[in-house]
């Protein structure tokens, strides 16, 4: 009997431990669409688990050994540790236990793939690639790290031959993904608790790109010095570069902003040789969101679209219709002329980029509210956090969202406030709770101002509740 070389059609129920996670849920949804029976557990129910249940998954609230039931295989994320009752029960029974990235890799082997990696911008870039391939008629399967507004989900199963996936570098598992086209947006020190050193992280990204087949393509942002250095080390594979710099194959030019909308042209410099030396230009492009970083992300998607044969007009129209992704500069409301934004940014590079985008989107003042995510991140990047809020007129820092970590001396909310002031910020303060945030906004915000809530923890709920809180008290 020949051994199976791809995911078998019959596995028995597939059990996900932590099915409500953004990465796990996308894989579960695609598996269900392919006809597999899916079940899973999470500590508590959520919109994500409710959606999966509506689609046909069996959902257990809480994690207990008996939840495994008749499962034939168990999928776990890196958040699931030894001692978890469901993991221990699966191993007691001798069931296959599969890491999330391993199951994603099995799905990817059924298709040709675009995998998007980078310290920042993965989710937005994944959404942009999906948007362009949709517009090009490719009908891609998509597994993303955020909810795509056009889908109402972080995943969809398409009938086409291409799959678009977000490749997470946080635990090194992205090197297991069999990418046909590999995108790298940027490389900054992050997730050092896994990598140990920046050199190890650099090596991880090089391995990710080097894994593409000989007929594949590496798509790299040469505006970022670490990525440009990576390009210099790549051999024997095709590379397309993108960015604002004059050497990029796909280059944004003539960029300006009007009412928070980016207007620009795209010079396809890498196609000059195919065009008798003339550089083709996609003129009159618009992207309905501010931020140079978002324009850069769009260039990565354009590089993929051109590689797959999409026409300039198709690309221009698709960019103009881009619907965005949840928690990436998401406008959650406006009260008395004050706009409230919810954003996932929690690394200093991301925070600086988001606040620059806020400046481009408003003529008023920018009020930043940040909840640091993990003591370890705040500690290791403390000086960067003290200087990344320069574009904000007012900075309010909430209590650190620990994500299960123990406090680290010198890396608290009050330490960061003191650090901001010491580094010259004119108006930095602590914010104690939602009520304090409401008082701050009433005290500081005027019509035309923008309140930007930043972080990967519970700050999103504060942002989404703020318009109603302000409206109720005003009534």
From Swiss-Prot:
Question: Into which EC class is this enzyme placed?
Answer: ligase
Which Gene3D superfamilies does UniProt cross-reference here? Mur ligase, C-terminal domain, Mur-like, catalytic domain, NAD(P)-binding Rossmann-like Domain
Q: Which GO terms describe its molecular function?
A: ATP binding; UDP-N-acetylmuramate-L-alanine ligase activity
Q: Which GO terms describe its biological process?
A: cell division; cell wall organization; peptidoglycan biosynthetic process; regulation of cell shape
Location in the cell reads: Cytoplasm
Q: Membrane-spanning residues where? A: none
User: Which pathway is it part of?
Assistant: Cell wall biogenesis; peptidoglycan biosynthesis
What keywords appear on the UniProt entry?
ATP-binding, Cell cycle, Cell division, Cell shape, Cell wall biogenesis/degradation, Cytoplasm, Ligase, Nucleotide-binding, Peptidoglycan synthesis
Any one cellular-component term (Gene Ontology) = cytoplasm
Q: Which residues bind ATP?
A: 118-124
Presence of the UniProt keyword Cytoplasm in the record = yes
InterPro entries named among the record's database cross-references:
Mur-like_cat_sf, Mur_ligase_C, Mur_ligase_C_dom_sf, Mur_ligase_cen, Mur_ligase_N, MurCDEF_pg_biosynth, UDP-N-AcMur_Ala_ligase_MurC
Q: What is its EC number?
A: 6.3.2.8
The reaction(s) annotated as catalysed by this protein in its Swiss-Prot or TrEMBL entry are:
UDP-N-acetyl-alpha-D-muramate + L-alanine + ATP = UDP-N-acetyl-alpha-D-muramoyl-L-alanine + ADP + phosphate + H(+)
Any Pfam family: Mur_ligase_M
Q: Which domain of life is it from?
A: Bacteria
The parts of the chain that form a coiled coil are: none
Question: Tell me, what does this protein do in biology?
Answer: Cell wall formation.
The record's similarity note reads: Belongs to the MurCDEF family.
Q: What is this protein called?
A: UDP-N-acetylmuramate--L-alanine ligase
Native source species: Paracoccus denitrificans (strain Pd 1222)
By which gene is this protein encoded?
A: murC
